[in-house]
Amino acid sequence: MAAEALAAEAVASRLERQEEDIRWLWSEVERLRDEQLNAPYSCQAEGPCLTREVAQLRAENCDLRHRLCSLRLCLAEERSRQATLESAELEAAQEAGAQPPPSQSQDKDMKKKKMKESEADSEVKHQPIFIKERLKLFEILKKDHQLLLAIYGKKGDTSNIITVRVADGQTVQGEVWKTTPYQVAAEISQELAESTVIAKVNGELWDLDRPLEGDSSLELLTFDNEEAQAVYWHSSAHILGEAMELYYGGHLCYGPPIENGFYYDMFIEDRAVSSTELSALENICKAIIKEKQPFERLEVSKEILLEMFKYNKFKCRILNEKVNTATTTVYRCGPLIDLCKGPHVRHTGKIKTIKIFKNSSTYWEGNPEMETLQRIYGISFPDNKMMRDWEKFQEEAKNRDHRKIGKEQELFFFHDLSPGSCFFLPRGAFIYNTLTDFIREEYHKRDFTEVLSPNMYNSKLWEASGHWQHYSENMFTFEIEKDTFALKPMNCPGHCLMFAHRPRSWREMPIRFADFGVLHRNELSGTLSGLTRVRRFQQDDAHIFCTVEQIEEEIKGCLQFLQSVYSTFGFSFQLNLSTRPENFLGEIEMWNEAEKQLQNSLMDFGEPWKMNPGDGAFYGPKIDIKIKDAIGRYHQCATIQLDFQLPIRFNLTYVSKDGDDKKRPVIIHRAILGSVERMIAILSENYGGKWPFWLSPRQVMVIPVGPTCEKYALQVSSEFFEEGFMADVDLDHSCTLNKKIRNAQLAQYNFILVVGEKEKIDNAVNVRTRDNKIHGEILVTSAIDKLKNLRKTRTLNAEEAF
């Protein structure tokens, strides 16, 4: 042990000396560079030599740090073994000798301690050995990190002073490698410092307690910011991960924030998580929060991290397959140390209220051939009111769940014999067909041409389009006469074949192909969810083939199209322009021109929009559209995406005005509803099953006052049915008139038509609505005309407007 201690001290001493050498050499490099600028004709050999020497020293230092870490770890293990031996010897000696009885106060303290330990044991079932080993290594690395920080901050001259520009315009002075964003916030206002979730330094998310490394622009983000929410929920996931390790003793995998909350996946040998265990996990999380465990960040070499996480094959996979740099970061809170890019909140106490509410099983990285994992979901907020509002929202969302509405209203169902493929019953099929008819009507107004294309293609098509290389695992494939075929997951390659089947001229452009073809995607069984995630679906899919000069007008037309459709449904929407990413393909001049035209289209459209720089697809810029439903949720359905690459892949050309027969078109991928199935799910939940009249699967219920009026009721129902309305008649003799009316209202019939002897004589009906608004007696022909007009105009509040 003494030899290892001496070796560790020697390595540490050498490391510190070489850090000093690096600083001196680097200052020499700077000095020589300055001299070179002032004397350009002098010898310039020293600078490169010195920078190479600095690089060599740094490489050697990296190796020294690793050796130092290993020596310290061995030293710590040896000390731990020595302490265990000494403790065992002491216990043996105490057992051999007589011990005095404990005092009353000592006895009481012992009882309290045992009670606390038993309470903790009732929640925490396992404390794996790897936790202790992991902590030991982290502490050694932390000491090294603190030593480096001390070295960086040693100068003590004016070069240590940095300027921090806060987003509100204030300027604050600080010290490099010492001043933190939290200290800057506290200098402005302690209230601001406490309400800040995370910092943004020079555009990069930054831990509040992480020292600044130079002059900085600083933003202080609170929970109402989306990026801050993601950090808050990511930190909450670490709290859940800590609780899961203590409770289950399994191996953690991924624990990200999601749109509303967070989850953590864990591999647990030979068992599954039970929903009855979630309250126990929540209690552990609350205890962790009370401890205010600080989040500590360390940058560590990949080699050392593979040693740290050698017990966990999943973390090692991430390191080997996902980490392409020599170092990466880990974060610690309490006993948990997790491979993580961060950043995080200052300490666990910042999470004011937490709820662990759901569990499920999944596969490692979604691959059913890999290990089964247990996934646990949670949500957290900075105050109790937000949690109460969330719980209320969840109850409302539960009542609006499209699967519940679909079952109650007999719209659709799913069956194990065809997972992910919906069976639409007559009333559900009415909604489906009404939506597609609506879009077809709009197509006719906007000069779209509907086409029909095959459902399956030879794999050579997908190889040509590029989908085979990146998407084949999501396609249903099969062999026919030794060739591989696949059911189409999208329409665009087929439409490219349609464009290319004969020569095209500029006079034809733009060509707008629309297709309701059936699509299939091989979604994993665990991801299937009602109508929102299916394997078989249809889209209101269209592809516009146009010239570069026509992009602006075509985009304007697409925006007007989606506004017309979404306003009919009563949706508001958000627009985001996603521009050229770093890995873009094609000529930059074409990208610039296309992005300019997209911006012009959005400006002329007149609705608010935001820029998402670098978030476009590699093959073209796009406009992302999100609709907002009745309970405040956002859904992305529409697509407006430019594509410069498919025309190249399929060698699509047209003859231009000046006779160039090699001119490339641009493709605009465009959908408004997106998946018709998913849109039905969104509409079901948006309306809560109270469908607007034009889309309603239960538009009219005719109720006779008594048996003598039943024949007339059937006649009235038949007249409405012949005009295309979803009309029914209630002839149930076991119910009173009032009960029949109430049943029709609960079943969400938009209009209830009561007929008695008077109405029979007058050839009329007595009209009331599902909300019990009474319109009174009206002739059958007049009622039909009014309802036809309300259907034609797709009036949202038809019951009021009748």
Curated annotation (Swiss-Prot):
Q: Which residues form the TGS domain?
A: 157-222
Q: Which residues form a coiled coil?
A: 3-23, 76-96
Q: Which InterPro entries match?
A: aa-tRNA-synt_IIb, aa-tRNA-synth_II, aa-tRNA-synth_II/BPL/LPL, Anticodon-bd, Anticodon-bd_dom_sf, Beta-grasp_dom_sf, TGS, TGS-like
List the residue ranges of the region (Disordered): 86-123
Modification Phosphoserine, positions = 453
Q: Does the keyword Coiled coil apply?
A: yes
Principal localisation: cytoplasm
Domain of life of the native organism:
Eukaryota
Name the PROSITE patterns on file: AA_TRNA_LIGASE_II, TGS
Look up the record and give one Gene Ontology term from the biological process aspect: threonyl-tRNA aminoacylation
Q: Which stretches are tagged as biased composition: Low complexity?
A: 86-98
Q: What is its EC number?
A: 6.1.1.3
Sequence motif: Nuclear localization signal, positions: 786-792
Q: Which reaction does it catalyse?
A: tRNA(Thr) + L-threonine + ATP = L-threonyl-tRNA(Thr) + AMP + diphosphate + H(+)
Compositional bias of kind Basic and acidic residues: 106-123
| CC terms in the record's Gene Ontology section | cytoplasm; mitochondrion; nucleus
- Is the Nucleus keyword given for this protein? yes
Its job: Catalyzes the attachment of threonine to tRNA(Thr) in a two-step reaction: threonine is first activated by ATP to form Thr-AMP and then transferred to the acceptor end of tRNA(Thr). Also edits incorrectly charged tRNA(Thr) via its editing domain, at the post-transfer stage.
Question: Which PANTHER family is this protein grouped with?
Answer: THREONINE--TRNA LIGASE 2, CYTOPLASMIC (PTHR11451:SF38), THREONINE-TRNA LIGASE (PTHR11451)
Question: What do we know about how this protein assembles, alone or with others?
Answer: May be a component of the multisynthetase complex (MSC), a large multi-subunit complex which contains at least eight different aminoacyl-tRNA synthetases plus three auxillary subunits AIMP1, AIMP2 and EEF1E1. Interacts with the MSC components EPRS1, AIMP1, AIMP2 and KARS1.
What's this protein's family per the entry? Answer: Belongs to the class-II aminoacyl-tRNA synthetase family.
What name does the UniProt record give this protein? Threonine--tRNA ligase 2, cytoplasmic
Instruction: Give the lineage.
Output: Eukaryota, Metazoa, Chordata, Craniata, Vertebrata
